[in-house]
UniProtKB/Swiss-Prot annotation:
Membrane-topology annotation of the record: Multi-pass membrane protein
Subcellular location(s) of the protein: Membrane
Organism this protein belongs to: Drosophila melanogaster
Gene Ontology cellular-component annotations: endoplasmic reticulum tubular network; membrane
Keyword Electron transport: no
Single biological process term from Gene Ontology: mitochondrion organization
The protein, known as: ADP-ribosylation factor-like protein 6-interacting protein 1
Transmembrane feature ranges: 43-63, 64-84, 129-149, 150-170
Keyword Transmembrane: yes
Biological classification of the source: Eukaryota, Metazoa, Ecdysozoa, Arthropoda, Hexapoda
Highest taxon in the source lineage: Eukaryota
Sorted UniProt keywords: Membrane, Transmembrane, Transmembrane helix
Family to which this protein belongs: Belongs to the ARL6ip family.
Amino acid sequence: MAASQVDQKRALNKLKHDLEPFRTAIVGAYGVLTWEKQYYAGVVFGVISCLYLVLWYLDLSLITLLSLLGVISILLNYAFPMVSRLIFGGVNWDGDQEAKFEDVCGQVCAVKGSLVVWYEYLFNERKSTVFVIVMSLGLLAMAWIGAIINNLLLMYLATLLILMWPGLQNKDIFKAITQRASKIINEKIQCGKRKLQ
């Protein structure tokens, strides 16, 4: 094996070890996010919408919101392993669940590797002029959009997109949309060719 493959395997094993107390929740969340059942898409949409509705209603300042999120994450990190042993202690961990857990850990490692590559690319010393111009225009466009549209709405839409993405990919929604769009475009082209003849 190459050194990078050994490092990837070591990182995967470390991640699996670190996430071991949360594996039942991770496998359950993976099933919900990939829409193993038809109604999971509605559940994801509803939960996200309710959370953001509560955030909108409470109208917390950024510092208060970050502090509360920190407290909740610390409490969950402390209490969840104990509670999960009580709730899921009798559940048998089978090969299918282990395969899903390994798949999720592999995907997380792949995303982490991609982020490291992007970080190294974005923050290397030499940048081309085109890169600087394109990044500056992109960031200015994002700043302009952020100034025009409510930030909570933007975060809601971003969260919705991020959490719906695995299910959309798993159900081949994008593939169906692109096939339908290419079919419509091809029909329009054929219709235009017939009119020209």
